[in-house]
Amino acid sequence: MRVVVAEDAVLLRAGLVRLLTEAGHEVVADVDTAEDLLRAVEQHAPDFALVDVRLPPTFTDEGIRAAVLLRAQHPGIAVLVLSQYVEERYAAELIASRRDGLGYLLKDRVADVEQFLESVETVGAGGTVLDPEVVAQLLVRSRHRQDLELLSPREHEVLGLMAQGLSNASIAANLFLTESSVEKNIRSVFTKLG
């Protein structure tokens, strides 16, 4: 897979590039700003973008805004967002874009290299990977609007297992479904929960 990495922390960026390269991916660009990310995508036409939520110059939401823009302008690119915190508004917008190949992980919860690389592969193959904390934050937001009533029984089951931190493959095994069925349910859940 051809990958662009956008991360402002030099050591973390170098580590991500090395991990991805050793896993057999071609890192076509590694950048430290959202502006450079957008340029790199135009120049290199990657299959996958790994994006930090907070990038220079303000370190607020430049990365996540760039990820939302990437998904709108380049729907074929898979996007995995890394963050220290859940940015609810943008996470919901990113998830609601209804395109395949999406992930949102919290940096401090990515403690296992194999699990991280599995997430990269899942997102790169068109799947969805969401950190349990992202799921929990969006659930809290939705509870206030009674949106959970819109979910089917199967969607409730999938959401509950996601909130426990299970991977798409584990959810599929638990519910005797295919991974693509799980991913379809995940997209449906977040479309309904907006």
How would you describe each model-predicted region?
Residues T60-G76, E88, A92-S97:
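Short amphipathic alpha-helix used as the core "switch/output" element in two-component signaling
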Residues D30-F48, T58:
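Acidic, metal-coordinating helix/loop segments flanking the phosphotransfer/catalytic sites
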Residues D52, S83:
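Active-site residues of response regulator receiver
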Residues R154-E155:
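The N-cap/first-turn positions of alpha helices
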Residues V10-A29:
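Two-component/phosphorelay signaling modules centered on CheY-like receiver
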Residues E7:
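Conserved acidic carboxylate
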Residues G165-G194:
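Recognition helix of helix-turn-helix DNA-binding domains
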Residues A92-E149:
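Short, flexible helix-to-coil linker/hinge segments that flank and couple to helix-turn-helix
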